[in-house]
Amino acid sequence: MVKRKRYRFRQGDVIDVEEFHDGRYGGPGTGRAKRAKPTEEQMRAVNAQNKAKRCRQRMLEYFREGDIFATWTYEVRNRPPDMQAALKDFQKAMRYVRREFKKRGYEVFWIRNIERGTKGAWHIHLVINEIGDTASIITKAWTKGGTWYH
């Protein structure tokens, strides 16, 4: 038997359906298996799936076609030593972005991911709602390197 969960976004315009087994499937007459404690790898996989689901659902709710997906990169001389420093840089830039959005009468919606590239350079992926001149605002906000749009 398959169970379904339905999530409605954007006042019901978008429906996200999640299907999964109900947990009682198996051969006739067999009971459920005893609960086993998941391994660290299994927990990491489940946590990654849950994080991806939350991100997908937030994007369905808060973002539309035409919103901006950008990457903030660092110049070599400005590279942070760790993720905490990169997070501080992001927070400083977002203070400017929030202030500019507020001046124009808009609320800012964003999702970000800070990661280290294959060659060791930190960068920040950012999805942000478009208000007309969002690109110029986020380019001006980021002073540590380049802003790339996808």
What are these language model-derived features?
Residues 1-122, 129-150:
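Positively charged, glycine-rich low-complexity segments
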